[in-house]
């Protein structure tokens, strides 16, 4: 293609993504757009086509972003090239959203006509505004009996401040309004700006590992052209690779002769290790490099840490390989080896949040067949020592001796909770119980309230989300961002079994709740740990002070069964003998801790 044609083609490209809260119909809308543009034959069509992971389809959530090229012949007779970049809606996957938005010029904002705006809708809209995208609101599910599109329209204008007068009323399920949406994309989403003649600059927004071709980069070309045979260079580490193939996704990968400015597609360049390709990096040509990289989006830091251990210790290397493979297309997953006396060898992993942690654990168990034990999640604490030093600790077993600690600071998050008015009391009670500080509360409309709290992240990590859903019958929506570190009265609690510390059961707790938390755990462990041949004390200790204790009674054989009647001294002799044997067992016996015991520390609650 000559320059003229390339520029004309660039004017026909529209890059957009779809943003929405969970369950507002984003994946269904994507399905309809694929059908309408006949990208996918009706034979291949299946619900949630872009959610290719089993886990995504089962939970009905989108975890990974996907990019697809569609051709659409508009009413003006021209054929446009659409790149649809599907994004997740859940708060833990915000970084997935931010990177797919970096590859777009426009965003379709889907709002449920019955539910209105939810907390994550707002969070994603702000991300889109940060990226200067053209936002087109769409009111979906208008065929529901409870739909009230007009009040949602005013809500979009009041809460977000977008002009919703032209918002398309649609129903992705019934296929209503799909054509209008496509026409609006043509009119409203700007064509990519960028210079075909400039040196190549392409943003890596994802990478997938292919066993045969190595790492495949998903890129959005910002300037220039890339074709097979070019030598490309990654700007963050200056490594060079030879391009073997470029192409696009029409869900399936299809090879192409070139990718030009504005295109979204993939580059295969037999890159061997995932570590070479950071998502957010810039690809350029080695022969004619760009002067400076694109400003990539920010590196996401994990907020939640937990230990992952294989149940069979010989699977340690398999677990490492599995984590490396997952890290390939999940740049936010971090891990380092660690050992525990109770659990053997494993990894300390960092996650973006609880759903992320859940999904990773499930993918490890499913895709790689590794049975795991997971320790209680913890956050990063800043520990200031008496000698003026300070250290970051994410693992309770690394906490220094209490006598050396001057203060401990913990991360607080700004939690935004949207909830129907009748549940405000329940939400406030929950937030208070989780040591939250009230910030503000505004009414969105007559019925819905936006409550903002500062809550310690450690309290959210446990089971805040489940509690929030159950106390509001599932109506609350919730979004959080890290706000600051604050000093807190925190202590480390150890659990002792038969006098020995079990390092994997240690956790950090606020001093005011230490006693009840300790009591709860020892009682819970008593139910879970099977009875042994000897008596086992379970103790909860802070430093050297025991705050709670309970005993698991010994199993004992009835040694008197063989004495029919007979002298009491004979019975006493047998009982004394049994007692001495139990005592000896206790001094050398060790206690097996079942997997549920580690999880029970997690699902701690004020039952």
Curated annotation (Swiss-Prot):
Localization per record: Cell membrane
Single biological process term from Gene Ontology: positive regulation of translation
Membrane-topology annotation of the record: Peripheral membrane protein
GO cellular component terms, A-Z: plasma membrane
One Gene Ontology MF term: ribosome binding
Cysteine pairs bridged by disulfides in the record: none
Pfam families: EFG_C (PF00679), GTP_EFTU (PF00009), GTP_EFTU_D2 (PF03144), LepA_C (PF06421)
Amino-acid positions noted as binding GTP in the UniProt annotation, renumbered to this chain: 23-28, 140-143
Enzyme Commission number(s): 3.6.5.n1
Catalytic activity: GTP + H2O = GDP + phosphate + H(+)
Statement: the UniProt record of this protein carries the keyword Cell membrane: yes
Transmembrane segments: none
Uppermost EC category: hydrolase
Domain tr-type G: residue ranges: 11-193
UniProt-recorded name of the protein: Elongation factor 4
Organism: Streptococcus pneumoniae (strain JJA)
Top-level taxonomy: Bacteria, Bacillati, Bacillota, Bacilli, Lactobacillales
